[in-house]
Regions:
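Conserved ABC ATPase "signature" region
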Residues: 114-134
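Conserved ABC ATPase signature
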Residues: 139-144, 148
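Conserved catalytic motifs of ABC-family nucleotide-binding domains
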Residues: 161
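Catalytic Walker B motif of ABC-type/P-loop ATPase nucleotide-binding domains
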Residues: 165-168
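Helical segment within the ABC ATPase nucleotide-binding domain
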Residues: 179-191
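ABC ATPase "signature
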Residues: 223-224
Length: 247
């Protein structure tokens, strides 16, 4: 079942076209990997999916459907709750770990302290972080390591009860142990959420993604099951990129 359907999507920043006639679908409860060199349109696609591109000099054409409904007919706050975005550099809010976790739920609803505590605990456990911070909830979030901060961002997103979690280079600059923890978290959550993972690390896409899309210069060059893309690609450019001949 398709969670997201994209049809003939074009995105412009001024006179520069960032996405060119993109059509693809995202299955519910899959990890979709998106690979490609810098400036290939990967991050622009994520920003289009929750309308972060909406700035004065950007314009878009085409259709993006979430559960069969045009995202432009969904209130922006609801859309961004349902389709969360985690950036390459962890964005922690000023204040404690607990305040970072509780900010979103408190902003969107009136909630009792006990219910809020339960949301925070569940989300931190789901993000594989609870055991490391359960005795530090009143510490500043800035005291966490880079990998912990990234998992805090995942937990903060989970606290909003999303349906799709988009991750833009979430392991950029992290050590192998931190990377493995984030990948393990994705696998553990996959039965309940849909993931879109942008990565410049082709090995990470090969390890984690059910299907992989290869972008180049704003175009979708190849899109198929990950094993097929990495072992028998249809386009020579895909093979060249995967084998490190460019990028």
């Amino acid at each position: 079942m398709s969670k997201i359907t994209i049809e003939k999507l074009n995105l412009f920043y001024g006179e520069t076209q960032a996405l060119k006639n993109i059509s693809l679908n995202v299955h519910e409860n899959e990890i979709l990997g998106i690979i490609g060199p810098a400036n290939s349109g990967k991050s622009s696609l994520l920003r289009a999916l929750n309308r972060l591109y909406e700035i004065d000099y950007a314009r878009i054409a085409g259709k993006i459907m979430l559960d069969g409904k045009n995202i432009f007919n969904i209130p922006i706050n609801e859309l961004r709750r349902r389709v969360g975005l985690i950036f390459a550099t962890p964005v922690v809010l000023p204040g404690t770990i607990y305040k970072n976790m509780s900010y979103g739920p408190k902003l969107h609803q009136r909630i009792k302290k006990q219910d809020l505590d339960n949301i925070v605990t569940r989300a931190l456990k789901a993000a594989n972080l609870w055991d490391e911070v359960k005795d530090r909830l009143d510490d500043s979030a800035s005291t966490l390591s880079g990998g912990q901060q990234q998992r805090l961002c995942i937990a903060r997103t989970l606290a909003m009860n999303p349906e799709v979690i988009m991750m833009d280079e979430p392991c950029s600059g992290l050590d192998p142990v931190s990377t493995a923890k984030i990948e393990a978290t994705m696998f553990a959550l996959k039965s309940d959420y849909t993931f879109i993972l942008v990565t410049n690390n082709t090995k990470q896409a090969a390890r984690t993604a059910d299907r992989t899309a290869f972008f180049l210069s704003g175009e979708l060059v190849e899109f198929d099951k990950t094993e097929k893309v990495f072992t028998h690609p249809d386009d020579q450019r895909t093979d060249d990129y995967i084998r490190g001949r460019f990028g």
